[in-house]
Amino acid sequence: SHGEASAEELADLAAPRLDALLAQGVTTVEVKSGYGLSLEHELAQLEAVALLGERRPARLVATCLAAHIVPDEHKERRGDYVRLVTDVILPAVAARGLASAADVFCDEGAFTLAEAREILEAAARLGLRTRVHGEQLTATGVATLAAELGAASVDHLEHVDAAGIAAMARAGTVAVLLPGATTFLADPALPPVKALRAAGVPMAVATDANPGSSPTTHLWLMAQLACVSYGLMPHEALRAVTVVGARALGLADAGVGRIVVGGAADLVATDAPGWRHLLYGLGDNPARRVWIGGREL
């Protein structure tokens, strides 16, 4: 129908963004749905990810974020939309093999803690890995819930409390830091990196690439800003965009994000004079040559 993009059109629109990531040596990319908010449109977005995966050598991980916000037509009967997600959208996605994970945005203006639990439990029953966007705008306690339910990661975390940090540390839940969002939204609240570090919570960094709050595909800049704005140390930032990112996606055991015998052999060559320089020049893309699975792009 008019004004609605097909999976083919969505894949065409996404291709230049994926190419920008590949040019930086980003070989593994998570792509989320969440801008459809109906069965038909969520499936189209995830089908676009599958199409992209056929057209590009990148390793793509599809996540269904149907639980992004409650669409306007369901505002009066929120439970109806939660049930649409748990009983219709997620089962259809799982049955078609279109996503390996499900994500929920639990925050003010999005889903409540109780709704998040319903959606995460439904996803887990379907065999989907789970992740959460949360503690971004307000402290909800969803970090504790995510850890309890075995979610792979919690994104944002500007307002996570001590209990949430402790729970994530115990469960090994990855904290995904998103400096693009705090920068673009001019949010004075920053994630408590010192407390996360002290507790031993693994920290990843991502672009949060999206039109509303983080319009960027520059993962190097995000790693650089994580050092400048969030106080990560250079070695932490490098791990954050390699092995810890792979861990958040459930790929670390497959040797993604690391140079190991029998691993993925995704390699990036740079002419930077030393590894710290990778995190120094704001906006620099230090990648000069890129290999995925041992094959040069």
Per-region residue spans from a language model:
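Metal-coordinating catalytic core of metallo-dependent amide/deamination hydrolases
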Residues: 1-14, 19-20, 27-141
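Non-catalytic positions within long, well-ordered alpha-helices that form the structural scaffold/packing
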Residues: 22, 86, 94-95, 124, ...
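Short coil/turn connectors at secondary-structure junctions
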Residues: 24-27, 55-60, 96-98, 171-172, ...
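Divalent metal-coordination and catalytic microenvironments
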Residues: 25, 32, 102, 133, ...
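Flexible loop residues that form catalytic
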Residues: 34, 107, 157-159, 267, ...
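Active-site-adjacent C-terminal substructures of enzyme catalytic domains
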Residues: 129-130, 139-258, 272, 282
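C-terminal cap of metal-dependent C-N hydrolases
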Residues: 241-243, 261-297
